Amino acid sequence: KLFGFYLIADYSFFLMLSFAVLLGAESIVDLLIYSALHELGHLSMLLICGGRPDSLRLSYYGLALKYSTQLSKIKECFVLLAGPLVNLVLYLLFKNEMNLLLFVLNMLPVYPIDFGRVISLFSYRLSKVLGCITLVLLIALAVYMLIVYKSFSLIFIVCYLIIYSFNY
């Protein structure tokens, strides 16, 4: 327990971090730092809204804050949007494209992404419809990027979103 909540580190987190360091992939280390700042935004707003964190999990896909505190829908929105807001502010201050990408990704209307969770607070059905439309568009974009740029990055993100959005 750290600061009153559990810090859980999956082995996959250390494996990915080790590969990043070995391969000199500073961008992965940067991504983890920006993801940590993103989660710190959620955590800060959770504390401001009177909530208490249960755990922070580190894994191959980044960091995830878990909490069981019951908040009003408005406070929950503040908590959910605080993370992307951190990335937007970092982008505006430092013109770092990775923070812009994190902001855009987290503002997609797909559950379990932050903005998808905001929508689901108010309408489960709308959340599912917007999520499906967004996923179809993302699949098309991912295939295009794979064919034209030989880039697999969006494929991985889309697979993650499909797996988690259909389990909700």
Residue locations for each model-derived region?
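Hydrophobic transmembrane alpha-helices and their immediate loop junctions
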Residues: 1-168
